[in-house]
Amino acid sequence: RSDGEYKDNRRPETVSFSKNVKDDILRRDFTINSFLMDEDENIIDLLDAKSDLENKIIRTINNPVERFNEDALRMLRAFRFVSKLGFDIEENTLHAIANLSASIKDIAIERTMIELSKTFAGKFRNKALKYMIESKTSENLFGLEDGIKYISNLDVELYPLEAFIVCFVIGDIDDKWKFSNKENNII
């Protein structure tokens, strides 16, 4: 598959299908997501992603600015992968996140909540949150910045909803955040 031009930092205007697997790989987000497997279960690595996997590096495929302009949600996915895997974000990738993090405000709040919930739930949560702070991404999360700073220094496990509650109690929360009735009653 190959994608046409992205207009909204999320979805391509057109999608065309190709039999060339390299076209498919080159449109993916991070090198660690570029592996293929053939019918004999042999792993195919066309982008030397094994090196990033072994070195625990999150790196965009090709130009990070282009990848994040195509889909701003990819920036939040980078933090989720840090939280889950304990990997480091490659310097150019992190620099692009820092420069483009304001576009996170254009992502549907429900998608943002899903990615943040997964980030809050990860074993390496604090490492991911520190990357959010370093890249100033936390400043673009509708009032969660102070809570994220606080949580990044906690040495206790929190459920995602508890992390949101901490952020809401500490921060100046925007009314964009949407929770279920059950979650609102807890909050």
Where are these regions (language model features)?
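Catalytic cores of the polymerase beta-like nucleotidyltransferase superfamily
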Residues: R1-I187
